């Protein structure tokens, strides 16, 4: 805890409000609300926490707070601040999570369409449906039963669907408002589960067609009846009152929360929404924050009723969700909340089971790799790769895997300092010596296994540095790629030989991940360095353009091409004088002409 935080903690009020934790860049990384700001904010910096909260606290270098009149006001403010700042440690709802609806347009000649966007007073909406496939299947069925207009053709033209009996040509069929009102009422009854009359009508038409020996038409009516029956069976009846409602349940364990929402429409469960996320403060408060964000998303239909668990404050929910909030006390409705809660518990347990299974698989892979190489279990693996283009901007990178997982805080980047031209062996020698001479000198944690990207030559160079130059006893292995640039062989031993490794084994998958990761990290770093070098060389020797202004241009425009495309005004907007801007543009033009001249 730094001195600034210590001083601010002493000044915190005993009031409700919101607090905003910031990192060293001044970026808001977490927004929370509290009934008592002093108690809540101080709790982050006192006592012990679980791992994820410790990670959050380790990044906090400053905080701000906003005092509110009430807990309700604090909740509303918190939701708005999260939506505005999108802090990385706050609950994040699934991106672009919207559900399809069926819509009857309010045009003079209505159409039946599928949409994910609800607009007020823009038609009748039915749904939501769990996915596009389900919505399309229902629409196809409705299209075959109800002859809505299918296209935007002028009303004096007959479309293709008219000939299929699925569209009412408006110059031929009824055009009076009463006809369309009856048709819309039929669709509403059908989608509300009152389809007995429609089935009876279809059955009568099927029998009549059979008597007339029109068996193809009779088969069509039979298929329609079958389609309605199938749609019925796919929707589980959850209540007899045919009410539209959302049912919330949540469960917390091991610092994680799972929220389940059942979407019940006309008494039938049509879909559920599942979200799992870590929580850092109070479970009930994080649940309220989730609900606020959930319904702030305009694509989430707000039903007539929302059921919430017993532990949640009804008044706070009512302040953020504009509908009837119910906390069921007994009977079927309470059982529905219990069912949502049970499903939340099951989903959370599944997550933990999968994590445990993954840990066991990874642990087994590390154990097996150690046995295969006849070394101690390689709990910590450090892997290296070089990257350059014909010797220009040469760099290297090191990635670290601990217990089979990337430890990104331990990753390191190296600019090659002593090697001229494209020499992978010399570059590898320099980087390994720099890394492990420091490990030896400073007593840093040494790996159980070093992996270099390359064949026999790279491995021999690495062993020479580690064993002969530095006198260390760290096992060294090499990973060779095939002609498709894919992980192929593991080299190890004295003398070096290919270690037999089944391609479908967990050990092979682990090594493949390590090689891909170190390659990605090295190439990304090389691109950054090359871009910066290209940027700097082009902008060298321009009067008035020092290192700070170069860095400003690099951060804003990224490339010389982007600067060349920018207007003088755009560059001046960064605080660079007009005369310097003109010099920059002239330099870029001169360089371009030099490259194009023979």
UniProtKB/Swiss-Prot annotation:
Keyword Cell wall biogenesis/degradation attributed: no
Pfam entry (one): UvrC_RNaseH
Ranges of residues in domain UVR: 196-231
Gene Ontology terms for molecular function: DNA binding; excinuclease ABC activity
Biological process per Gene Ontology, one example term: SOS response
Keyword terms: Cytoplasm, DNA damage, DNA excision, DNA repair, Excision nuclease, SOS response
UniProt GO cellular component terms: cytoplasm; excinuclease repair complex
Subcellular location field: Cytoplasm
Domain called GIY-YIG: residue spans: 14-91
Signal peptide: none
Top-level taxon: Bacteria
SUPFAM superfamilies found in the cross-reference section: C-terminal UvrC-binding domain of UvrB, GIY-YIG endonuclease, RuvA domain 2-like
Subunit composition and interactions: Interacts with UvrB in an incision complex.
Similarity remark: Belongs to the UvrC family.
HAMAP family: UvrC
Function: The UvrABC repair system catalyzes the recognition and processing of DNA lesions. UvrC both incises the 5' and 3' sides of the lesion. The N-terminal half is responsible for the 3' incision and the C-terminal half is responsible for the 5' incision.
Name this polypeptide is given: UvrABC system protein C
């Amino acid at each position: 805890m730094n001195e600034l935080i210590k001083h601010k903690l002493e000044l915190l009020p005993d009031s409700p409000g919101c607090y905003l934790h910031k990192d060293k860049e001044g970026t808001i990384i977490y927004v929370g609300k509290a009934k008592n700001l002093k108690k809540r904010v101080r709790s982050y910096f006192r006592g012990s926490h679980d791992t994820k909260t410790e990670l959050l606290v380790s990044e906090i270098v400053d905080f701000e707070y906003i005092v509110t009149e009430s807990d309700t006001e604090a909740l509303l403010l918190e939701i708005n601040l999260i939506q505005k700042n999108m802090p990385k440690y706050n609950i994040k709802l699934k991106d672009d999570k919207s559900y399809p609806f069926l819509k009857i347009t309010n045009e003079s000649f209505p159409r039946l369409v599928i949409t994910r966007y609800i607009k007020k007073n823009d038609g009748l909406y039915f749904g939501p449906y769990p996915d596009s496939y389900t919505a399309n299947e229902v629409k196809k069925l409705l299209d075959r039963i109800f002859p809505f207009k299918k296209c935007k053709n002028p009303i004096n033209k007959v479309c293709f669907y008219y000939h299929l009996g699925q569209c009412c040509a408006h110059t031929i069929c009824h055009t009076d408002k009463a006809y369309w009102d009856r048709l819309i009422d039929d669709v509403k009854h059908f989608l509300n589960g009152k389809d007995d009359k429609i089935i009876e009508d279809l059955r009568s038409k099927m029998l009549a067609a059979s008597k007339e020996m029109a068996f193809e038409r009779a088969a069509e009516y039979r298929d329609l009846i079958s389609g309605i029956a199938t749609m019925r069976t796919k929707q589980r009846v959850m209540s007899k009152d045919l009410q539209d409602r959302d049912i919330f349940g949540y469960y917390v364990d091991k610092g994680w929360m799972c929220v389940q929402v059942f979407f019940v429409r006309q008494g039938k469960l049509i879909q559920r929404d599942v979200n799992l996320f870590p929580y850092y403060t109070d479970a009930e408060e994080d649940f309220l924050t989730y609900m606020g964000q959930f319904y702030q998303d305009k694509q989430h239909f707000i039903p007539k009723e929302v059921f919430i668990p017993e532990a949640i404050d009804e008044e706070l929910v009512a302040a953020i969700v504009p509908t009837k909030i119910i906390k069921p006390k007994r009977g079927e409705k309470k059982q529905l909340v219990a069912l949502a809660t049970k499903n939340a518990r099951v989903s959370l347990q599944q997550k933990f089971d999968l994590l445990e299974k993954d840990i066991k698989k990874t642990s087994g892979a590390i154990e097996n790799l150690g046995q295969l190489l006849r070394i101690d279990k390689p709990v910590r693996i450090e892997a290296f790769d070089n990257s350059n283009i014909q010797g220009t901007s040469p760099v290297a990178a090191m990635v670290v895997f601990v217990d089979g997982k990337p430890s990104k805080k331990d990753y390191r980047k190296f600019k090659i300092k002593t090697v001229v031209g494209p020499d992978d062996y010399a570059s590898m020698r320099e980087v390994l010596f720099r890394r492990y001479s420091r490990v030896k000198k400073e007593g840093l944690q040494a790996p159980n296994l070093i992996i270099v990207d390359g064949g026999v030559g790279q491995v021999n160079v690495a062993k020479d540095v580690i064993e002969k130059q530095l006198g260390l006893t760290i096992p060294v292995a090499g990973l060779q790629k095939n002609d498709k640039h894919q992980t192929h062989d593991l080299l190890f031993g004295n003398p070096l030989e290919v270690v037999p490794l089944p391609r479908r084994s967990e050990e092979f998958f682990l090594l493949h991940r390590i090689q891909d990761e170190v390659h990605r990290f090295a190439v990304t770093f090389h691109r950054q360095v090359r871009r910066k070098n290209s940027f700097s060389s082009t902008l060298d020797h321009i009067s008035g353009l020092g290192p700070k202004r170069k860095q400003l241009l690099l951060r804003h425009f990224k490339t010389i091409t982007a600067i060349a495309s920018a207007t003088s005004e755009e560059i001046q907007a960064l605080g660079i004088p007009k005369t310097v801007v003109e010099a920059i543009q002239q330099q870029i033009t001169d360089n371009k002409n030099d490259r194009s001249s023979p």
